[in-house]
Amino acid sequence: MKRKQTIAAMNERGRRNEPFVFVIDFETTTAKLFRPDETDKIWWQANKQSNFARPVSEEKEIEWETKPVSFHQYKKGYDLVQHHIHNGDTYLLNYTQPTTVKTNLSPEEIFHLSEARYKVLLRDEFVCFSPEIFVQIDAGKISSFPMKGTMDASLPNAKERILNDSKELAEHNTIVDLIRNDLSLVAENVTVEKFRYLERLKTNQRDLWQVSSKI
């Protein structure tokens, strides 16, 4: 579904007071809408709500081999980011690179094994999961919970180290200010209810301390 069709379909379902699940690509050019109870094309979980039945887990030795990009390729992008920051073109940027994964798990198995609060599986296309709420609307109140900064929870004094890190603080100040400004475009009386609180996240390698805010 294209952009204009998506907006029209969302508005129509909203007008009829019909809940729906939607998936949009990062360029916002293509989208898909589903009923919350559809399971043939999409599985989803949002906090404690979901549309799938959890299967009985089978003991299986998991094969998981990652192949990150080379240091040279990573540094090439990093240097470009630094150039634009020093040039004043941006002051906050999420720099990521793709990592190839070789595994004996199916997308469905990856979906079920993930302990993330939020996850979605679009059949024959992708699986995605995140610990983070982007935006939440409840009873006319819109909230966002930006996460910036992680640290290995097993490190000595990890909590104190991440909260006292000047780089992490500067990054968090920036994203909170950006999200607050964005919410002010669509809402009134925007406030920061919680600034820099810690959450413990479990990953397949180790536990992490994650710094969040509530706006």
Q: What label would you give each PLM region?
A:
Residues 1-215:
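Extended alpha-helical targeting/anchoring segments
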